[in-house]
Swiss-Prot record:
GO molecular function: structural constituent of ribosome
Name of this chain's protein: Small ribosomal subunit protein bS16
Classification via InterPro entries: Ribosomal_bS16, Ribosomal_bS16_CS, Ribosomal_bS16_dom_sf
Signal peptide (UniProt feature, chain positions): none
Biological source species: Xanthomonas campestris pv. campestris (strain ATCC 33913 / DSM 3586 / NCPPB 528 / LMG 568 / P 25)
A cellular-component GO term for this protein: cytoplasm
Pfam families xrefs: Ribosomal_S16
Gene: rpsP
UniProt record similarity statement: Belongs to the bacterial ribosomal protein bS16 family.
PANTHER family: 30S RIBOSOMAL PROTEIN S16 (PTHR12919), SMALL RIBOSOMAL SUBUNIT PROTEIN BS16M (PTHR12919:SF20)
Taxonomy, superkingdom: Bacteria
């Protein structure tokens, strides 16, 4: 089964997450199929908090991929921000 989930990066006490497509059997920071965007929970000022390729997420969901709860919330946030920007 394929999931769209977060993988952690960044430094100690400065988390940064990549939003990836991966097999459920892979480790959290292990091998991925495709990188779809990123999530920066400690963004400041004009830095974007969520950058996500919504079209690719729709593609993978159409192929049967499942989103984790956090990624589902980030997807909604990214969709709203893209709609507001357009």
């Amino acid at each position: 089964m394929v999931k769209i989930r977060l993988t952690r990066g960044g430094a100690k006490k400065r988390p940064f997450y990549h939003i990836i497509v991966t097999d459920v059997r892979s480790a959290r920071d292990g091998r991925n199929i495709e990188r779809l965007g990123y999530y920066n929970p400690v963004a400041q000022g004009a830095e974007p908090r969520v950058v996500l390729d919504v079209a690719r997420v729709d593609h993978w969901v159409g192929q049967g991929a499942q989103l984790t709860d956090k990624v589902r919330n980030l997807y909604r946030e990214a969709s709203k921000s893209q709609a507001a920007a357009a």
